[in-house]
């Protein structure tokens, strides 16, 4: 495998295309190409766990083809980002609900209720935003209310500390979201993606080329590994359609041949193994 990769990179250096040389200059250590080799192999191996590795690889490259903020907002990449943000905000909301229950419980710091209500309003307002650009602005301007002083001597100190600790956790969630996703403006993010796009395009091409050359070499030497068996099984048992992968005629014959299919350690299966299992299963066709 490493021999194939080294030979491929040597050929690319001899060809001397600007796109490759720019990529190599950006990602090699200067002394050797180990970093580039490791990157290609890592992405190649990861892509092989997907039923349509080519489509997955293209989707990764496509994520960098963002001309403007409007396109960024509509991208699948940004939809995943927004979903993750909303999930974290929901976690924050649940924490605040717990804090309010503690504050209003017997011997609890009820004086904190007003502050917790304001905190909840901050989280709810952030959660209601559907635009990444508007959310970036909102996170930049988040302001927390000062917590009221507790003067009730009957309140348990333990409950005071519990509420304060939960409140700090909530603030931490918001701070982490801001640091992870809003460290720069949407316009700056678009410019960064544009700058990285040529390198990612070249990386995708290198992964594809390596896959082709590696498969050719294994065929020439009559070598097959477990990952190859998965890929060949998928090609035999499925056909690609507009709706994704559907069972081939051969798979349909297996569906009629077997009454039950059992799989060991199902929780450890990957997406390609799931696709193979579904191809010979009758569940999707409504048959038990």
Residue ranges of model-derived segments:
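Conserved ATP-dependent motor core of P-loop NTPases, especially the RecA-like helicase ATPase domain
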Residues: 1-135, 224
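Short coil/turn segments at secondary-structure boundaries
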Residues: 14-24, 54-60, 102-116, 138-142, ...
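Short, structured coil/loop segments at alpha-helix boundaries
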Residues: 14-20, 75-82, 97-113, 153-156, ...
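Coupling/switch/interface segments within P-loop NTPase motor domains and analogous charged loops
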Residues: 14-28, 34, 41, 117-211
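Generic detection of intrinsically disordered/low-complexity segments and helix-coil linkers/edges
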Residues: 38-40, 50, 126, 133, ...
